[in-house]
Amino acid sequence: MIKKHVLLSILGLFIACTVGAQDNSMADEKAIVKSGNMRFTVLTPEMIRIEYSAKLQFEDRASFVVINRHLPVPNFTQEERDGYLYLTTDKLELRYKLGTYPVSNDRCNPNLQITLDVNGVEEVWYPGKQDPYNLKGTTRTLDRAEGDVREWLENGLLSRVGWAVIDEREPRKDGSLSLMFERDTNGGMDWVAQRKDTAALDMYFMGYGHDYKKALGDFTKIAGKIPLPPLYVFGYWYSKFQRYTEQDMRDIVNEIRSRDIPMDVLVIDMDWHRNGKTGSTDGTEWTGWSWNKALFPDPAGFISWLHDEQNLNTTLNLHPADGVFPKEDNYDALYADLAGRYSDIKADSLTNEDGTIRWNIENKDFYEAFFEHILRPHENIGVDFWWVDWQQWMIAQNEPNLGNTFWLNHVFFNDKKLQAKNRPFIFHRWGGLGNHRYPIGFSGDSEATFSSLAFQPYFTATASNVGYGYWSHDIGGHNQEGANDAELYLRWIQYGVFSPILRTHATAAGHIERRIWKYANFEQMRDAIYLRYALIPYIYTMARWSYDTGVGMCRPMYYDYPEADEAYRYEGQYMFGNDILVAPVTSSDKGTNVSEKDIWLPEGKWYEVMTGELIDGGSVVTRSFTREQIPYYYREGAIIPLYPRMMHLKKRPETLTLQFTPGARGEFNYYEDAGNNADYQTACTFTRITQNTEAVSYTHLRAHET
C-alpha cells in the first residue's frame, strides 16, 4: 500500500533558473575538419555531421531540422594514412577515402564508413545502408486511420542496431525538403531560404547505441528544445464539430460546471465563421475569417465570459488555403496593405479572378499583413491560440520544396512567440523532423473503434523517438458508424488521462455524443477526469523535464530498459513520466465488465494503484480490471504529487498531497512556474522531495541548468 500521505503547503516562491547559451548555427571551428569537397563537424562523441559539396558551398545557416551546431567540442583525433582520413572520438571511428564521393556501391570497402561498438558488437555504417531495426517516429496525421497504421510512420532517431541518420537532403513523406532559415537580424521571424548548393549532401550520423535518452537529449541540443506548453493545456478540453450557437456553447459550459466536471479549454470548431465566399450565415465554407453573427452575435462578450466567469481558454478552427474572400470583414484593409507591399509584382499575383486574395504564407509581406488585419483582431478580443486544420496543399505553391504543414507551424508558433505575452503554441499536424519545436500536434480524424484506440498508446509513445512529445487525439474517435459505445468512450477517456492532452472530440454527425453526462457510466468518465487533474503536478513537472532533457512525457518502455526484449514487444504499455507505468485497456470486455490484460513489469517492485497491491517485477503478469479501473503503476520509491479536487487550473490549490510508494529510496523535483509565462526558462522554482525509510525532506533548489 502507499506508505504515507503528506500535505505540503505550496510556497509562492519563484527563483530564477539558469539559462543556457542561445542557439547558434555556426559550429566551433575546432570541431570542423575539411578534406577536399568534404566537410565533417564533430558535434558530440556520438554525432558527426557529414557534408559534400562539389561547389564547396557548405551551409552554416540553420536548417528546418538543425538550428544549433555550436556545442562544446568533444575530444577527437584526425589522421591521414594510406589514402584515408580517420576521425576518432571516444565512441566512433570515421574513415573516409580521400578525394572520393562519399556514396559508393562498394559495400565491402565503402568510400565512407563509421564504426561503433554496440554492447560488444561492432556495427559499421556507410551512406545508403538500410536499417530494418529503426524504431520509427511519427507521421503527419491519423486522418481516416482505422487500427494499426504503423506503416505510415517515418523513421525515427533510434534503432536497435545502435545508429540512425538524419539526412537533410532526403525528401520527406509529403514530398518537401528540409530547407534553410534566413536569420532576421532585426528581431523578427526567421524566414525560409533555399540551399546554396541544391546537389550537396548533408547528413548527421548518430551512433548512440542503446542510450536512447542521450540520443534524444543531444538531438534537442542541435534541433532545439521541446517547448513547455501552458499549464492549462494539460486540463480537459471539450470539443465537437457541430453547428453550435453561442447559446449552445454557453449551455454546454454551464452543464459541465453544474455537474462538477473540470475543464480548461473550450474548442470552437469551424462554424464560428460565416461562409467566406458568399458572406452567407446559413452555410459554412471551409475557409472563413469573419464571425458568423447569426450564431455568435457577441463574440467579444462570449470570449470575455469564458475567460472571466468560467476560467476557460479557447481556440478557433482555421482552414486557410482558399485565401481571403472579398466579403470578409477586413478584406479592404488587407488588400490595401498588400497592394502596397506587392507593388513590384504583377497585380494578378495578389488575387484570383474573383478578387480573392491568394493564400501566400511563404511570402513574408503576406504573413505580416495577414496576421495584422485578419488574425490580430480575433486575438485582441481573447482568442488564446489557433487550431490550424487541414485544407492546404502539401507543398507551397510559391516556394520550391517547402512543406505547408511544417511552414504553417513555424509561422503560427513564432508569431505567438514574437508577441511575448504568453507562452506560444500551435495546434496543428506533424510537419516533419524539427516540428517538435512547434507543439501541439492534432492527430486528425481517426475512426471510433477499439482497434484505433489500441494503436494510439504505441503511436503516441513512439513519436517521442523524433522528439514529438505532445500529440492530441480525438478522444472517443472522430468518425463513427452506428450507436455510441459507452465502454469504448470510457476506455478512450481513461487512456486520455495518461496521454499528453485530454481532448474529447468527434465529427458533426448528430448521432455522435461527446457530452459525458449523456452516458450511463458518466460518473466513471468524470472520475477519470478527476484523476487527470489530481495528477497535474506530476504531469507538469514531467513536461518541464521533457523541455530540459528532450525525452517525451509518454515514452516507450525501451528507453528505460533497452536490453529487455519485452520492452520492445509490449507496445501497448509505456512510461508516463519517470515514475508511472501505464498499460491502458484498449479492447472490449464483451459485456463482462472485466478485462484481462498481460502486462510486463520490469525488474523491481511496482505499486498497482487501482488495487493497492505491491507486485514483484521482472515478469509478465496477467491482471483483471473492472471498467472503472485503469492499469497504472508507480515505480517503487516513487513520490507522486497530487492536487486536491479542482475545477480548473487558472487558480491552483494551496496544498499538495504527496503519495510515497514503499521500497527504494525516492526523489522528486517538483516544478512550478506562473503557468503561462513566456519566461518560464528563468522564472520558475524546483522543490526537491526525497524519502528513505526514516525521513522525508523538502529542499527548494536555487538553480536549475537548462
Give the positions of each predicted feature:
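Catalytic core of carbohydrate-active enzymes
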Residues: 435, 440, 465-466, 470-473, ...
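Catalytic and substrate-binding clefts that recognize carbohydrates or anionic sugar/phosphate headgroups
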Residues: 79-230, 240, 253-258, 624-644
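Bacterial N-terminal signal peptides
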Residues: 9-16
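A low-complexity, Ser/Thr/Gly/Pro-enriched, surface-exposed linker/loop concept
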Residues: 45-82
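Conserved small/polar residues in nucleotide/adenosyl-binding loops
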Residues: 699-706
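Aromatic- and carboxylate-enriched substrate-binding clefts and catalytic-loop regions
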Residues: 262-525, 560-562, 570
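A conserved hydrophobic secondary-structure block that centers on an alpha-helix together
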Residues: 146, 240-262, 266-269, 273, ...
